[in-house]
Amino acid sequence: MIVAPAEANNQAARTSAQTRRRVAVLGGNRIPFARSDGAYAEASNQDMFTAALDGLVDRFGLAGERLGVVVGGAVLKHSRDFNLTRESVLGSELSSYTPAFDIQQACGTGLQAAIAAADGIASGRYEVAAAGGVDTTSDPPIGFGDDLRRTLLRLRRAASHVERLKLVGKLPATLGVEIPANKEPRTGMSMGEHAAVTAKQMGI
């Protein structure tokens, strides 16, 4: 941690404000909203984000163009989606040289992506950038329960056939899946329930 006098911090803030460039939103694109398990039941986050990007490309004539960056993300991601935004860029008509990275902050993911892109433009790192978010409840990342996952990992590490057979014998007792729940892990309440509590406490 670096600590500086308040005067120095204020001076740095003034200097930063003077050198930061103005940022403008030039346009946008999205795919239509649809009910869960409806039109997009077989579509992945990557499918939908790529489609939204290609719509942006078509709308603004960006085919083959290299942008400064594409920032995006999703809340419910499969393990295969660890590089979701980059893979979506590679699947789009944008130049494959366009950098991209993921960001995640609950339902504010798309907004935080836009802020990150705008900050990059304001500081001079990029001339132009794209940002967005995507999520589907039709294709949630259903995972193994901890017991099954740990047993499978032990099976992979087993050094002998005898050890493997013992572990295989334990599998039926450890079967289980985990489906993402619409609730905060610490409170067990959904975002809507939290909003209701907040409104009640603040008299809204």
Regions found by a protein language model. Give the residues of each.
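Acyl-thioester C-C bond-transforming condensing/cleaving domain
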Residues: I2-R21, R35-A43, F49-G64, F82, ...
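Short glycine-rich or small-residue beta-strand-to-loop segments that form or flank ligand, phosphate
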Residues: V70-A74
